[in-house]
Amino acid sequence: MIIIDGKNYACVVCLRGHRGSSCQHQERALIEVRTRGRPLLCKKCRAIKQQLKSNLKCVCHLQPFLPFANEYQELLNFTQKNPILASLFLFSTDKDIMNSSLNPASQAYTFDLGRTLPISEDILGYRKPLSLTDASNRIDASQLNEKENDSFTINQEADIFNFAKYLHSKDDISGIP
C-alpha cells in the first residue's frame, strides 16, 4: 500500500484481486483504500475517535434538532405580522415537516379551505417562476367568500405564497448532522 498524506492508496487491479495491502504499483492509477468496518455517521465523531484512539459510538443523531436561530427568529417575526400564518404553522406536525422537506416536489401548500396553492417550480430550481398574477388567477373567487372566518383574500394568499417561496429558498439541509 502506498501512503500519501496519511491516506492509504492501491491500484485498481490489486484492490479487485484483494491484494490492496501489498500493492506497490506507483505507475498505475491509484484509489484510496477505505478502512474496514462500518463507517461512522458523522465527521465530528470520526475526528474524536482518531484523537482518543478508542471505540466510540456516534450519538449525534440522538441529539434534538434545533432550527437555526436566525431563521427561527425570522419565522417568528413574519408570523407575528401575519396571524393567519401563525395558525398554519402551529398545527403542522414534525411528520408533516419531515415529509415536506424530504419530497418538496410532491407537496403543494394546503390551507384550511382545502384549496392548494400551486408550487412555483422556480422554488425547486428548474423552471420559470409563477408570477403573483398567475397564482391569483388560479384562485376561484367563489371559494374566497364561502366562509367569512376561514376565507383568505388574494393578498393574504400572495403573502403565504411568497413566504413559502422564501422558506424553500432557505432550505439547505446539507449541513444537518
From Swiss-Prot:
PROSITE patterns: COPPER_FIST_1 (PS01119), COPPER_FIST_2 (PS50073). SMART domains: Copper-fist, Cu_FIST. Residues 1-40 bind DNA. Zn(2+) binds at C11, C14, C23, H25. Keywords: Copper, DNA-binding, Metal-binding, Nucleus, Transcription, Transcription regulation, Zinc. GO terms for molecular function: copper ion binding; DNA-binding transcription activator activity, RNA polymerase II-specific; RNA polymerase II cis-regulatory region sequence-specific DNA binding. This is Copper-binding regulatory protein cuf2. One of its GO terms (cellular component) is cytosol. InterPro entries: Copper_Homeo_Regul, Cu_fist_DNA-bd_dom, Cu_fist_DNA-bd_dom_sf. It comes from Schizosaccharomyces pombe (strain 972 / ATCC 24843) (Fission yeast). It is found in: Nucleus. Gene3D superfamilies: Copper fist DNA-binding domain. GO terms for biological process: positive regulation of transcription by RNA polymerase II; regulation of transcription by RNA polymerase II. It holds the Pfam family Copper-fist.
